[in-house]
Amino acid sequence: MPSGIMLKQREIVLIPIPFTDLTSQKRRPAVVISSDNYNETHEDIVVVALTSNAEPRDFTITLTSDDLEQGVLKVTSMIRTDKSYTLNKSIIIKVFGRVKTHILLKIKEFLLKIIEQHNTVN
């Protein structure tokens, strides 16, 4: 991504994701969840994955173009709040949309549920 472009919370970005065997990579969309202040003061951003596989599963949020403040989705997609990544801003390929505030609130709710799940302690 060209330097000098400021990434904002709620933006939808395109990022390269490597295959698990690291032989290749594929471009995938993601939603920026780190705060604007964090994004301004750090080289990294925090994102959650976005997929066009519209099969509902735990910790997913359905996303349509109606849920966007900016941009358009070609197909109904799912936000995978269980797939979060910290990435260097330099690998961002492009910004192509921004989700509405209510979607960020849903993302936060799901992240809190993931963090607060009861686990067995050994």
Per-range role (PLM):
Residues 1-2:
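Helix-hairpin-helix/helix-loop-helix acidic hairpins
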Residues 23-26, 32-67:
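Compact nucleic-acid interaction/catalytic patches
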Residues 30-31, 47, 81, 107:
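A structural motif
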Residues 18-22:
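Short, charged beta-turn/beta-strand-edge "cap" motif at the junction between a beta-strand
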Residues 5, 69-122:
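C-terminal terminal-subdomain/extension
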